[in-house]
């Protein structure tokens, strides 16, 4: 008799965005003429940059000729892309990385979910609350989180770090020792950021406690303000304790193309039961070479084109487009009387629901009355209740239309 990994039974009934899709589809069946505007899941709407498309075309043509055909590529990524990543994303900020410290992958979602495999199941993990669900769910699957408390909306062995309105949506250090710390800045879902000084507090904590920070930096390209670090490695000592995840998905429109990278400095040590230290970099390389065959050559060629002079201009134009959407959403919600966070250094706007209205209740009201779909804060954790996320990744026309509807129908 085949038996399941019973940790899967501890997961919520459906993934957050699957539940949203179910409710939207049900509403559309009942209201086929409704013009639904989706500002929920963080998928992009702008096409790939022309320079990226051209690079991918050329790469595909190479794959069609025997003399330039490429089979299995290096699991860690092609050197031509890794060199550009280091030279453009890190060196200008004074961060020195080795070629073997960057791992190209098919997405930050899969990397943030898979990285926990290296850690023992007895490690204590900490997450901000609200939080991107993948961090929690992947650890539930591994058996690291304990059982789910339906009353609290939390797992028994996770240390939750509340991000509250009173605390400006920024987490405080854990009061109990932890081994794994998930941080995402600019933050999904709140859109908030940390200063270099605030981030240093976390790095210092990790160094003192031999903890490891799993730092999701997927939205760094959207940072607008001075003084906000683009990489955790801008903080002294971070190379000893932090893994950084980045993605081309939102930056360059690769949500359907799939390319990202993870930085694992060779300075980071992880310990066995005897206290002996082992290289986290080597363990991740071992994991990747066993379970991953690398990102396709045409996709990596497209990603490398992002770093050309023309590529940088085209990508920046797309980022500017989305951040103008963010401004429209943020200012429109404020005009309508809503309390909002984010939308300045990130493409997410985190709004407080009216009065004591629950976030799923607000979801249904917004969909039925304004025909606008967002993401209920409760889907990101217990401390997300009473809040709601809108994204700036829609088209300009739909973004403006959605805000006008909210201002007219949701006061």
Curated annotation (Swiss-Prot):
Pathway: Amino-acid biosynthesis; L-lysine biosynthesis via DAP pathway; LL-2,6-diaminopimelate from (S)-tetrahydrodipicolinate (aminotransferase route): step 1/1. Its EC number is 2.6.1.83. It comes from the Bacteria. Gene3D superfamilies: Aspartate Aminotransferase, domain 1, Type I PLP-dependent aspartate aminotransferase-like (Major domain). The keyword Transferase applies. It catalyses: (2S,6S)-2,6-diaminopimelate + 2-oxoglutarate = (S)-2,3,4,5-tetrahydrodipicolinate + L-glutamate + H2O + H(+). The modification N6-(pyridoxal phosphate)lysine is found at residue 250. Coiled coil: none annotated. Substrate binds at residues 15, 42, 109, 132, 188, 293, 389. The keyword Transferase applies. Its cofactor is pyridoxal 5'-phosphate. GO terms for biological process: lysine biosynthetic process via diaminopimelate, diaminopimelate-aminotransferase pathway. Pfam families: Aminotran_1_2. InterPro entries: Aminotransferase_I/II_large (IPR004839), DapL/ALD1 (IPR019942), PyrdxlP-dep_Trfase (IPR015424), PyrdxlP-dep_Trfase_major (IPR015421), PyrdxlP-dep_Trfase_small (IPR015422). Involved in the synthesis of meso-diaminopimelate (m-DAP or DL-DAP), required for both lysine and peptidoglycan biosynthesis. Catalyzes the direct conversion of tetrahydrodipicolinate to LL-diaminopimelate. Is also able to catalyze the reverse reaction in vitro, i.e. the transamination of LL-diaminopimelate with 2-oxoglutarate to produce tetrahydrodipicolinate and glutamate. Can also use m-DAP instead of LL-DAP as the amino-group donor, and oxaloacetate or pyruvate as the amino-group acceptor. This is LL-diaminopimelate aminotransferase. It comes from Desulfitobacterium hafniense (strain DSM 10664 / DCB-2). The gene is dapL.
């Amino acid at each position: 008799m085949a038996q399941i990994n019973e940790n899967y039974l501890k997961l919520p009934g459906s993934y957050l965005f699957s539940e949203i899709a179910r409710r939207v589809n049900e509403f559309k069946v009942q209201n086929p003429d409704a013009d639904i505007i989706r500002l929920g899941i963080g998928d992009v709407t702008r096409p790939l940059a022309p320079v990226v498309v051209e690079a991918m075309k050329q790469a595909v043509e190479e794959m069609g000729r025997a003399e330039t055909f490429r089979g299995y590529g290096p699991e860690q990524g092609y050197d031509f892309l890794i060199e550009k990543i280091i030279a453009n994303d890190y060196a200008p900020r004074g961060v020195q990385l080795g070629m073997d410290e960057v791992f190209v992958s098919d997405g930050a979602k899969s990397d943030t979910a898979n990285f926990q495999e290296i850690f023992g199941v007895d490690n204590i993990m900490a997450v901000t609350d609200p939080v991107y669900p993948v961090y929690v769910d992947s650890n539930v699957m591994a058996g690291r989180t304990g059982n789910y408390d339906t009353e609290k909306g939390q797992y028994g062995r996770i240390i939750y770090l509340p991000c509250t309105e009173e605390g400006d949506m920024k987490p405080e250090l854990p009061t109990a020792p932890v081994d794994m710390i998930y941080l995402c800045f600019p933050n999904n879902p709140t859109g908030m950021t940390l200063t270099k000084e605030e981030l240093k507090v976390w790095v210092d904590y990790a160094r003192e406690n031999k903890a490891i920070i799993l730092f999701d930096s997927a939205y760094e390209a959207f940072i607008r303000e001075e003084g906000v670090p683009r990489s955790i490695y801008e903080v002294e000592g971070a190379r000893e304790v932090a893994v950084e995840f980045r993605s081309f998905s939102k930056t360059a429109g690769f949500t359907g193309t799939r390319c990202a990278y993870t930085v694992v400095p060779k300075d980071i040590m992880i310990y066995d039961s005897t206290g002996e230290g082992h290289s986290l970099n080597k363990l991740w390389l071992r994991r990747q070479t066993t379970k991953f065959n690398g990102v396709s050559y045409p996709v990596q060629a497209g990603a490398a084109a992002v770093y050309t002079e023309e590529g940088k201009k085209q990508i920046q134009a797309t980022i500017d487009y989305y951040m103008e959407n963010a401004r429209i959403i943020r200012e429109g919600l404020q005009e309508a009387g809503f309390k909002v966070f984010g939308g300045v250094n990130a493409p997410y706007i985190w709004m407080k629901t009216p009065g004591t209205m629950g976030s799923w209740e607000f979801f249904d009201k917004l969909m039925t009355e304004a025909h606008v779909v967002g993401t209920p804060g409760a889907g990101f954790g217990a401390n997300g209740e009473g809040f709601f996320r809108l994204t700036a990744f829609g088209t300009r026309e739909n973004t403006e239309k959605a805000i006008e509807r909210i201002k007219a129908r949701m006061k």
